[in-house]
Amino acid sequence: MAVTVETLEKLERRITLILSADTIKNEVEMRLKRLAKTVKADGFRPGKVPMSVVAQRYGYSVQYEVMNDKVGEAFSKAANEAQLRVAGAPRISEKEGAPEGELAFDATFEVYPDVKIGDLSATEIDRVSTEVTDAAIDKTLDILRKQRRTFAQRAASEGAVDGDRVTIDFEGKIDGVPFDGGKAEGFQFILGEGRMLEAFEKAVRGMKTGESKTFPLQFPDDYQGKEVAGKEADFLVTLTKIEAQHLPEVDEAFAQSLGIQDPTLEGLRADIRKNLEREVKNRLIARNKSAVMEALIKVADLDLPKALVQNETDRMIEGARADLKQRGIKDADKAPIPAEIFHEQAERRVRLGLVVAELVRTNQLQAKGEQIGAHIEEMALSYEKPEEVRRWYFGDRQRLAEVEALVVENNVTEFVLSKAKVSDKQLPFDELMV
């Protein structure tokens, strides 16, 4: 087989493949003979169908299959001999003017780019850290108490205050006309928790059971309901029930109800601290990793293979369709999703993937077995049944591959931070946890 390689624009290459027509013909005949042993046809015993009938029925499909296989083999061999790192599948087209007894094909494709990474020591990156304070533990305790609160109906003479669970009937109109979502009966919400617009809650605050009130409400310009955004509505609200909340005391009985190993107040706070520190650690890793990846994108110079960008765009479109399907959208598989909306993000992902791969390759940052095991062990110990979590990960290659990818990203993050010009900054707990 003779091979010629042409360099086209940037990453694009073309290989001309020359195949022997006899090789194709012999392979087709061999496959047809093999097929004839199992073919069934009316009027013939199994395996006794004449070759002429087999060729007439299956000749075209077998020849197509053989051509695909042989061209694919020839392309792989030629690319390997030329030491080309092929990015994406080649476009194959038959070429005219081949010598007698031969077939010629052009394979047009892209190769992976040379990735040039700038001076990491001159790259500035902010590395954040966060401390789990007593105030953070107190706030978590308040959340746990609210999750276990009970409610008791208030006396008819008492007005609604923040923390109460109120039940209301309401109807809203714009210019005297009702609108979708503007009417409900027996609607419940906790006053003061921000589920409703502040102006709505302000109007309900202080109302008593059985009381009705009419008030205007201005919808924000960025309100999620586009049909009412920026408009003023008039609401009629009737308060049918007020229930005062009762928060459990933070005592040993409360600690026991949470099922912690040391059901004392000290044990409860220690358990909360441990969980918060684990969550803070994971969020800091993600945040600092994001800062590193953003820096890598800026410091790297490379051309992007169009095929890889297209493949990533296609994956993102399929992901969007799967999301629509999960939400119950009819005919989600056929939803027209413009590729342009994902193009920029797809380019970013491909660029970052190539840069990370280059760093891993040139600095031996591959995930080690003990790193993968330690990562899984850390996750497993955060669950009630660690052994089940271990089995869940180690029993599936795809899950292990996902953990391996995370470990590689962490290795890259640590490597870049060790080389870059890092500024350490303290981030408030609440800001990190948003």
From Swiss-Prot:
PROSITE patterns: FKBP_PPIASE
EC main group: isomerase
Keyword Phosphoprotein: no
Location of the protein in the cell: Cytoplasm
Domain PPIase FKBP-type: 163-248
Principal location class: cytoplasm
Catalysed conversion reaction: [protein]-peptidylproline (omega=180) = [protein]-peptidylproline (omega=0)
Gene3D superfamilies named in the record: 3.10.50.40, Trigger factor ribosome-binding domain (3.30.70.1050), Trigger factor, C-terminal domain (1.10.3120.10)
GO biological process: 'de novo' cotranslational protein folding; cell division; chaperone-mediated protein folding; protein transport; protein unfolding
Enzyme Commission code: 5.2.1.8
Keywords: Cell cycle, Cell division, Chaperone, Cytoplasm, Isomerase, Rotamase
Keyword ATP-binding: no
GO molecular function: peptidyl-prolyl cis-trans isomerase activity; protein folding chaperone; ribosome binding
Gene Ontology cellular-component terms listed: cytoplasm
Pfam family, one: Trigger_C
NCBIfam families the record matches: tig (TIGR00115)
Function, in words: Involved in protein export. Acts as a chaperone by maintaining the newly synthesized protein in an open conformation. Functions as a peptidyl-prolyl cis-trans isomerase.
Family note: Belongs to the FKBP-type PPIase family. Tig subfamily.
Free-text note on domains in this protein's UniProt record: Consists of 3 domains; the N-terminus binds the ribosome, the middle domain has PPIase activity, while the C-terminus has intrinsic chaperone activity on its own.
Protein name: Trigger factor
Originating organism: Methylibium petroleiphilum (strain ATCC BAA-1232 / LMG 22953 / PM1)
Gene (UniProt): tig
